[in-house]
Amino acid sequence: MSQNKLWGGRFTQPTDKFVEEFTASIDFDKRLYHQDIRGSVAHARMLGRQGIIPQQDVEQIVHGLKDILAQIEAGQFDFSVGLEDIHMNIEARLSQKIGEAGKRLHTGRSRNDQVALDIRLYLRDEIVEVVAYLDMLIDSLLEQAEKNLEVVMPGFTHLQSAQPILFSHHMLAYVEMFKRDKGRMDDCLKRVNVLPLGAGALAGTTFPIDREYVAEQLDFPAVTRNSLDSVSDRDFALEFIAASSILMMHLSRLSEELIIWSTSAFRFVDLSDGFCTGSSIMPQKKNPDVPELVRGKTGRVYGNLMALLTVMKALPLAYNKDMQEDKEPLFDTIDTVKGSLKIFADMIREMRVNSSSMGRAAGQGFSTATDVADYLVRKGLPFRDAHEAVGKAVAYCVENEMDIIDLSLAEWQLFSPHFSDDIFAAITVEASVNARDVIGGTARNRVEDEIRRCREGK
């Protein structure tokens, strides 16, 4: 392929070879080839429809672009660093294939609005995939909740036993988080899904183009309303990476819990062998590498967000070469999020829950102490007085190396005369769980309601 620059008319000396390599983006933006060709086909058809270029040229351009697409997908296209980016590589090859007609393609268009279009087309498709992977993960969590509906586990605050809850309730907490992540992705898509083509370099174009026609061809519901803004901003990419950062934070929190739960100290869950690795020296080890890596990759996505924010933070309008640095953080975020979601959905689905370990732990650590306080309140004691009495009972148990379930009625009555025989039924783990019979609570019937709502898409 010829290495002549498509913008070289103003220059009298060739580009320095190191500068050529330093400024080229083809190594990473070649993944936009499909979007670039799709956008060019729509642009060419619009040019012909408007009488800006001959119709026979349009036919040659479209045919040539389809041939190039087939070449790229067959691995037969020779990408050139000397041609800088995916746009110039495709356009130069087109002109080489069909001659003068190929040189008419860029009429009424700049690389500035062209690349903005390519990124939006690409990100639009990727957001749809991310949402599909989120649906897969949510389905896996719901499956675990349904399979282990009655399993009781300790709920934690400060990583200390707090109150017993259903394991299914815990899974539904993450379902809610990932549903909000879906909402953020859907909302981001609305701002991504706007056509920038037609903005030109920054001020629009002198040709009588039809932007609405191009939008229709490319399935955009709207066109951008300011040419300068269209080529100057990447807030739509930033918004996606920000939403992805929150999503990865949720995955990281779940990762941390799975790592803790799978330790020999907890034994709450057993991750499938296919998602773990061993040690090169310790034969007994089964390491939770997948959640550990997802936890680590979360920081990578945070870094991508900060990288792009920093690129954009002080750029004057309109386009600046700094903005070439938008693609690698965006592409890396897309790859990281999709990979993490897919592997997590599969891992959660195959995870085994150790109900006996969870059940034993649920009753430890004075986990039903709040129920005792509530019991006293129902007997007429003010809550703060009830809290004080139960706190003293817990201190007594700690001193005597026992749990509150081991206390006799006589011992209970040391702390309040309001205690009677019905205290023993009130402080079982099962009673504690099912007493939380409020919307969003951990009572079994409420959890079943929420699973049903989730399955119905509410």
From Swiss-Prot:
It catalyses: 2-(N(omega)-L-arginino)succinate = fumarate + L-arginine. Pathway: Amino-acid biosynthesis; L-arginine biosynthesis; L-arginine from L-ornithine and carbamoyl phosphate: step 3/3. Its main location: cytoplasm. GO terms for molecular function: argininosuccinate lyase activity. One of its GO terms (cellular component) is cytosol. Belongs to the lyase 1 family. Argininosuccinate lyase subfamily. This is Argininosuccinate lyase. It comes from Trichlorobacter lovleyi (strain ATCC BAA-1151 / DSM 17278 / SZ). The lineage of its organism: Bacteria, Pseudomonadati, Thermodesulfobacteriota, Desulfuromonadia, Geobacterales.
